[in-house]
Structure formats: C-alpha cells, structure tokens
Design a protein with these regions (language model features):
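N-terminal leader segment of winged-helix/HTH proteins
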Residues: 1-53
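Charged, amphipathic alpha-helical coiled-coil/dimerization segments
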Residues: 9-17, 93-153
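N-terminal helix-turn-helix DNA-binding core of bacterial DNA-binding proteins
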Residues: 25, 42-87
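Pre-recognition alpha-helix immediately N-terminal to the DNA-recognition helix
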Residues: 33, 44, 61-64, 123, ...
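Short, locally clustered residues in the helix-turn-helix/winged-helix DNA-binding domain
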Residues: 39, 64-68, 129, 156
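DNA-binding alpha-helical recognition surfaces that contact promoter or target DNA
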Residues: 64, 90, 153
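Alpha-helical transmembrane segments and membrane-interface helix-loop junctions
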Residues: 74, 160-164
C-alpha cells in the first residue's frame, strides 16, 4: 500500500495564497471544496486498486455495494454510486467472468438480473477495504474526534436528504 501525501500546491510552484483563495472566493464554493476532497480521497486509492488488483472503479463499486446488500441489479448499483449505467454494465460482465459475482433472473422484472457477490468477491473486497481506511485517515487526521462526529452527522444529513 503506497502512502499518498496531501502535497502543498506550493510544491508545484503555485502561490499558496492564490490556491487558498479559490476555495474561499468562487461562485460554487461548497461544491468545489467537496469535489476537491472527494477526488483527493478516492482517486489515489482507485489508482492503487487498479495497479494492485487490476480492478477499475466500477468493478470495485460492485463489490462494495454487493458486500453490504445481498442482491442488487446493475441499475441499483448505478443509482447508489452515481456511476453511469454503461460503466456498471461493463463492470458486471468482467466481474462475472472473473468469478466475483453471480447473476440470476429477477422474478419481479424479467428485463433485470439480480447480482450477488461470491465468496471470492467478498474476499477481494476485504483485501481492498484497508486501502480506503488508510486514505480516509490521511484526510481526516486534521479533525479531532468531536469534529469527526460532526462531519459524520453532516454527511449523513446530506446523503439522506434525497437531493436529486
């Protein structure tokens, strides 16, 4: 597992003040900051997962979702993750070929197939989770325990708001 550092923009020959200003003075301040943090959190981990396990983002997201919910359709996974349906469909085919998922007809909707994770898929998921936990800690270490609880409450509220 590689250690990913949150490098200062000054190391890339940028004026730190200008860099900080973009986070404070723009017309979509919260959106930009959330996007920045999300990218800093997940992109390095997905690069590591691709290098170490040969999995693309959609493929791992299938494992993640099916590790927590026993049966899902590809559309369910696309809806839960915000990933495009076509990237999830490609991921389903690859994960079926590699033996990480099984597929069966959906008795409620003949056009859909129900996906389940195999024991091999569960094991792969268990191997990958620590990579995310390490990266999460690298990002969240700037917060004390009260701030982490507050962040957790705020994120739960935003995710639960059912915003389109």
């Amino acid at each position: 597992m590689r250690e990913h550092r949150l490098t200062s923009v000054s190391t890339r020959n940028r004026n730190e003040r200008e860099f900080a200003a973009i986070f404070e003075r723009n017309e979509v301040r919260d959106t930009f900051r959330i996007s920045y943090l999300a990218n800093r959190l997940v992109i390095p981990v997905y690069e590591d997962i691709k290098r170490e396990f040969g999995l693309k983002r959609g493929e791992y997201l299938l494992l993640f979702c099916l590790s927590h919910i026993e049966e899902l359709t590809a559309q369910d996974v696309a809806d839960m993750t915000g990933r495009p349906r076509n990237s999830i469909s490609r991921a389903v085919h690859r994960m079926l070929e590699d033996g990480y998922l099984t597929r069966s007809p959906d008795p409620a909707d003949g056009r859909q197939a129900l996906l389940r994770i195999t024991s091999e898929g569960q094991e792969l998921h268990r191997q990958i989770v620590p990579w995310f936990l390490v990266r999460e800690e690298q990002i969240l270490c700037a917060l004390d325990s009260d701030e982490r609880r507050q962040l957790d409450r705020l994120l739960a509220k935003l995710v639960g708001s059912n915003a389109p």
